[in-house]
Structures are given as structure tokens and as C-alpha cells.
Amino acid sequence: MSKTIKRIGSRRNEHRVLKGVIYVQASFNNTIVTATDVRGQVLSWSSAGACGFKGTRRGTPFAAQTAAENVIRALMDRGMERVEVMISGPGRGRDTALRTIRRSGILLSFVRDVTPMPHNGCRPPKKRRV
């Protein structure tokens, strides 16, 4: 009679995902990178703050690069081959995050800038006087 083998980890991580979407939300204060499958189910996410950067360092390009690398590492473990990239926001980390995704070896279907642009909607905040 054979022994039952105890599982380490969950069954949820077993299914391979070949195609997905990476969302990069780059604000002036932080960069958040989220990876989903094509249905929108979140597979992995990371942010500059979650990577250990605090305060003003969260808005730096290096922090965005680190956050993107963390997400890509998780996607490679799941066998991701092709992604679409949606970039949103005016932050300094957007170009660095895209460059990191390009360098990773995952094929890019397309890159789209989905930054919301007002058609003269709400009044913007007043200019800072430093």
C-alpha cells in the first residue's frame, strides 16, 4: 500500500499562465506594478513601498525597477510568455519599469499609455510655493 504524500504549498500556484497584462501605475510618490491574467485575476503585485523604500525614495526610478523585477520574477515562475503593458500616471518610474519589463525576456504584445486625461474637468490643485 502506497503512502500519501503531504503537499507543501497550495494547488493554486500550479496552473501555468501563458498570457497576461502588466499594469504600471506611476505616481510622483510611488510606483505600483500589478500583473493579471487576461480575465483580470491578479497573479502578482509589487510596489516601491512594498520593496522596502520609504518616503521620497519610493518615487525614484530605481524603486520602480525593483518593483517591476519582483513582479517579473513571479511571472517567470508561472511560465508567462507574452504580456500586454498598460502604463498610467506621470511618475518618474514609468520609463524605468517599462525598460525592466522589456529586458526580462517576456514578449510584449503591445504597450499602451492609459493615463487619464481630463477634457477640462475638475480644477487642478494650486501651484506649490516652496
From Swiss-Prot:
A GO BP annotation: translation
InterPro entries: Ribosomal_uS11, Ribosomal_uS11_bac-type, Ribosomal_uS11_CS, Ribosomal_uS11_sf
SUPFAM superfamilies, per the entry: Translational machinery components
Cross-referenced PROSITE patterns: RIBOSOMAL_S11
Localization per Swiss-Prot or TrEMBL: Plastid, Chloroplast
Keywords, alphabetical: Chloroplast, Plastid, Ribonucleoprotein, Ribosomal protein, RNA-binding, rRNA-binding
Gene Ontology MF annotations: rRNA binding; structural constituent of ribosome
Chief place of localization: plastid
GO cellular component, one term: chloroplast
Subunit structure: Part of the 30S ribosomal subunit.
Family designation: Belongs to the universal ribosomal protein uS11 family.
Name of the featured protein: Small ribosomal subunit protein uS11c
Protein's organism: Pinus thunbergii
